[in-house]
């Protein structure tokens, strides 16, 4: 069972889709699925031209960039997520209001970066070993 990550911003046409596509690229060899959503999108809208340019510069395939369509943050979109990365505290608040069970799984990007900086490789290895071979269980243990 893959690890389910969601990135969240306002319109789902710049920050969260860039984060989604870049995480997919970086984590392509791992059992991870990444999606994105917006708190106030125009459903179906494409990424902005500037966001598309940045994505291309990051090495994201054109087909993936062009396939993006903005979608609204909702309970079904949040269902089963192991990690939610919000662009701002307001976005994180919107996530937790929709699904309070995500309180300990939803972070702003900055919060997640600060927290992950303090976890050592040894701690990750120990947590992973205790969780067995299931990638999702290993991720949750970490």
Question: What are the functions of these language-model segments?
Answer:
Residues 1-81, 89-93, 102:
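Conserved active-site segments centered on acidic
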Residues 96-142:
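Phosphate-binding/catalytic loops
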């Amino acid at each position: 069972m893959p690890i389910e990550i969601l990135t969240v911003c306002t319109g789902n046409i710049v920050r969260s889709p860039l984060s989604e596509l870049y995480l997919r690229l970086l984590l392509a060899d791992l059992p991870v699925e990444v999606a994105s959503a917006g708190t106030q999108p125009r459903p179906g809208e494409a990424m902005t031209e500037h966001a598309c340019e940045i994505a291309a510069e990051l090495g994201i395939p054109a087909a993936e960039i062009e396939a993006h369509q903005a979608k609204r943050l909702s309970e079904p979109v949040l269902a089963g997520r192991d990690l939610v990365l919000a662009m701002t505290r307001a976005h994180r608040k919107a996530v937790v209001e929709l699904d309070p069970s995500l309180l300990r799984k939803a972070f702003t990007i900055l919060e997640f970066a600060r927290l992950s900086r303090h976890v050592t490789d040894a701690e990750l290895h120990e947590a992973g070993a205790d969780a067995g071979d299931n990638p999702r269980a290993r991720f949750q243990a970490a």
